[in-house]
Amino acid sequence: MAEDSESAASQQSLELDDQDTCGIDGDNEEETEHAKGSPGGDLGAKKKKKKQKRKKEKPNSGGTKSDSASDSQEIKIQQSSKHNAIWQQISAGAAMGGDTMEGEWIDLRMYHKNPTIPIQKLQDIQRAMELLSACQGPARNIDEATKRRYQFWDTQPVPKLNEVITSHGAIEPDKDNIRQEPYSLPQGFMWDTLDLSNAEVLKELYTLLNENYVEDDDNMFRFDYSPEFLLWALRPPGWLLQWHCGVRVSSNKKLVGFISAIPANIRIYDSVKRMVEINFLCVHKKLRSKRVAPVLIREITRRVNLEGIFQAVYTAGVVLPKPVATCRYWHRSLNPRKLVEVKFSHLSRNMTLQRTMKLYRLPDVTKTSGLRPMEPKDIKAVRELINIYLKQFHLAPVMDDAEVAHWFLPREHIIDTFVVENPSGKLTDFLSFYTLPSTVMHHPAHKSLKAAYSFYNIHTETPLLDLMNDALIIAKLKGFDVFNALDLMENKTFLEKLKFGIGDGNLQYYLYNWRCPGTDSEKVGLVLQ
């Protein structure tokens, strides 16, 4: 992760780019708002933008559209290009300083046409062009990304965007000499390690995220991570207090910044590495020109390095150097009336609300025999199921019993897991989804949108299509409004058939200090909250 000595390039990254945005790439503080994903999974883009997207974009499900899948497009889901998940998700951003090469070309042309123009004026024009480019927003695809400069990431052990990768392994060797002192924050701010067992501190973090974390482009929805969800996401087995890294105002001790890391064993092709997942980077909206986010990234890197860990995994809705995989969110309406009322989605031409509700209607009972909530007695069997199943993918976790217990045992309003037990008492399959509501802003009646996110779904005997249809039924019965899923693992086999609608933004997966060939979304077996 970030270098331990303060290089000139890294120091420069703290001084440039004063956009009123937030990010984790160190190049642009915008992308805390983009990495995790829009609330509810890619919500709220303008209808005009969505219609334009649909004209030129065809869902790629790996198969032929069924009639029901075609019908499901009658209700349009408004989606922005933000996505779940920061470093879930590192949350990254546009290239700092924009496309300076373009600025240089403009200057050269102007100089040849009029060599009497002062060099200083040409330099001023170049700087203006760079700022304009930076303000045009983060790169959403490889073509856009290759035109940008990434001054922060260019100093980091990550592959270059144009690099052809055929090897596997660490980019930099593990270090022995790790910086012992925290990095310096801008004047007026101080570090604080957050003790989330303290209810007041947990409430402070909840408030910071609730008021400043991921929103959609139209400021209609905002993720609403409950305090209980935060404890689940931030304190898995092996969690460390010092990896809950906060920033406060020195004068009044107000919490204005946060970044976290949690440990995980991740298999990358044939190598299993102990690494961290980086998540929940957030800087208060009013302080995003203070360059706090780059220091947060470097500080969490230093703290992780001190524990002997030198690799990380993260996701972002923008393109940085260099994605190992790109996935897409899909969305399945469970409560069409509410989704239309809050403008999460809208009715297409010649489609009434009643027809839409009929289209998305689900049975009242599940189909799979032996389906029941997971219990503590199932931990070992679930661990065996998931670890064997995930071996077919190129990027996947390797879990022990404690991790399976933490991530999958049902917790109300946080995680739901159902197992399939056959007549002989053997567990053959399981499904899981976690709960992440969004606050609905500026609506007179609806204050919250309840979204389910597909987690891990393992099948050995039950067809995956049947298993996921049961997941939709359970989510509907539990009062969810929408069910979201990425097109990773084997999900493409059921998305269209179960009337999911495709989102219009990608979720990139990244590895820090690890080089390996890229992989397709169906070979990704890792889901970050």
Swiss-Prot record:
InterPro entries reported for this sequence: Acyl_CoA_acyltransferase, NMT, NMT_C, NMT_CS, NMT_N
Annotated residues for binding of tetradecanoyl-CoA: 153, 281, 283, 289, 291-293
Modification Phosphoserine, positions: 38
One Pfam entry name: NMT_C
EC number: 2.3.1.97
Keyword Acyltransferase assigned: yes
Gene Ontology terms: biological process: N-terminal peptidyl-glycine N-myristoylation
GO molecular function, one term: glycylpeptide N-tetradecanoyltransferase activity
Protein name (record): Glycylpeptide N-tetradecanoyltransferase 2
Source organism of the structure: Mus musculus (Mouse)
Origin organism lineage: Eukaryota, Metazoa, Chordata, Craniata, Vertebrata
